[in-house]
Structure formats: structure tokens, C-alpha cells
Amino acid sequence: MSKSKLDLDFFKKEVFMAPKTVAIIMDGNGRWAKQRGLPRTAGHKKGADTIRTVALAAQDMGIQKLILYAFSTENWKRPEDEVSYLCKLPGLFFNKFINELMEKNIRVTFAGELEKFPQATQDVINKAVNMSKNNTGLELCLAINYGSRREMLLGMKKYADEVVQGKRENDLTEEEFSKYLFVPEDIDLMIRTSGELRISNYLL
């Protein structure tokens, strides 16, 4: 087997218990491109295409939910041309791979504030979500325009509004608060593809 392919033999053994929820920080794409004398956008495209490989491998391993940190709230500070390309990537990815994801019974969801993206990108993502909503395999969740501090702030505001409006009592617990988050589940395994040891405002 070539090094470019994932060897899943170990994960198929009975002794391996797959984590239920895995989160991946997709970074290092720009550095990958620079090392090869390519524009940063080439690195981002390579990273997006890799989503397919990772999602199919996660499905084979028995992972229930895969959350990919694809676009953070801090990414808006990058150069305008790079941001423009990053905003187009979800559309390029789903137009290329949505049929295969459907065949593999993979369900697409997203975490974050989609409204800031161009309408065309929103439409493609929402189409993928709606097309796959009845699938029962791996949940592939894209964290886009996502930041954990922002997630908690929005959750607290929503909870406070409901208390003020008399929709609920002021009796918040950790378990209840998780329902106000984009990602309510506990993360069993987090991976940062560049190897750096920081979480960059992701799923705090």
C-alpha cells in the first residue's frame, strides 16, 4: 500500500474502539503550498479534497461524527483574495463530492454562522445538508465561520433572552447550556493536522 493511502487494518481489529466524535483542525495548508512553491490557494484546495478521504476513512472506522474546522471567525482577517477563495471552497467541494457522500450514506451538517458567506456558498451548503438529512452513516460537520468564544457568547445571549421572555426558568446547568451551542457533544479526540499544540478558539 502506498504511503498516500490510509491503512485501516489496525482500526478494523476488534480491540479497537473508535471514538464517537472526532474534531480536526485543518491547518498547515498554506505552509504545505509554500514549501512546494505554490500559491496558498493550492494548499487550501488540497486540504478540501482531503476531506473526502478523511470522511470515508472515518466512516470505515465506525466514527459517528467528524467535525472539521474549515473556516474560523479569525480567517476573515486574512488577505482579501485568500478569503474570497476560502469562501468558494465549500461549493467546489460539494459540487465535486456530494453524490459520493450520498452513496456512502454520509450526513452533512455545519456549525457556525453561515449568513456571512456569499449567497451562492450558503445555497450549496444548505443543499448538501438537505440532500443528506435522512442519511444514517457518519455525520460530517463543517465548522465554518466558527469560533468557540463566539459560540458561547451567542448561546448565553439566547439563554438570557429566553429567561427575560419568560420562556424558561433561570436554572441553567452545564447539560442544559450545551443545547445552546453549535456543537453540544463532548469531543473524544482532537487532531491538528499541522502538529502544532494549540486549539485556536476551537470547541473550548
Locate the predicted segments by residue:
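Flexible, compositionally biased loop and terminal segments
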Residues: 1-204
